[in-house]
Regions:
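Unchanged
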Residues: 1-179
Length: 179
């Protein structure tokens, strides 16, 4: 495996925790763990996470792997992605979202992305921080997609001023096969 961690500024504790990746068998000369630091102090377009991803396009492009599991540091959980990856491949989805069904009485955190599905399991709507949501399915800010699609999303968004990865997915719910 190859794990690229996009490290925000002031991340000394994270870097110290990850070290060389030995604890996760990622301390190798080829592939392994890569800490990807910001290349500039100012965002390229001023908004969204696409800027940060665009700074590390070469890492993605040069990777020998065909798929990406994209996640965030805002969610802490223990997850084995193997079954999600197999599901992604078996459904021939463009993007597979990792989500959890929220209990009726549980409050959502600010910025939550709520996802609606049709009867076949395909995403029909994504709501970003809605005051009231028609769905109880909260996207965990984790997804599986091809490396090519991720590169395409980043380059498309950058050619239009940057933006946020989730908003790119939201804008393309009808064009992409998202489950």
């Amino acid at each position: 495996y190859s794990v690229g961690v996009l490290v925000p500024e002031s991340s000394g504790a994270l870097i110290q925790h990850l070290r060389a990746g030995k604890e996760w068998d990622l301390d190798r000369k080829r592939d392994g763990l890569f800490l990807l630091l910001p290349q500039s102090r100012t965002p390229l377009s001023g908004t969204g996470d696409i800027d940060f991803y665009s700074q590390h396009l070469n890492y993605l492009i040069e990777s020998k792997f065909d798929y990406v599991i994209k996640t965030t540091s805002q969610v802490l959980c223990n997850i084995d992605y193997r079954s999600a990856f197999e599901y992604h491949r078996s459904t021939k989805a463009d993007v597979t979202l990792i989500y959890r069904r929220m209990p009726q009485n549980e409050k959502r955190s600010p910025g939550s992305v709520m996802v609606s599905f049709d009867k076949s399991g395909w995403v029909t709507d994504m709501e970003i921080d809605p005051p009231v949501s028609k769905s109880r399915n909260m996207h965990m800010r984790m997804c599986i997609l091809s490396k090519k699609l991720l590169v395409d999303i980043i380059t498309y968004a950058m050619s239009r001023g940057g933006g946020d990865f989730i908003r790119q997915l939201q804008a393309n719910v009808k064009n992409l096969r998202i489950n």
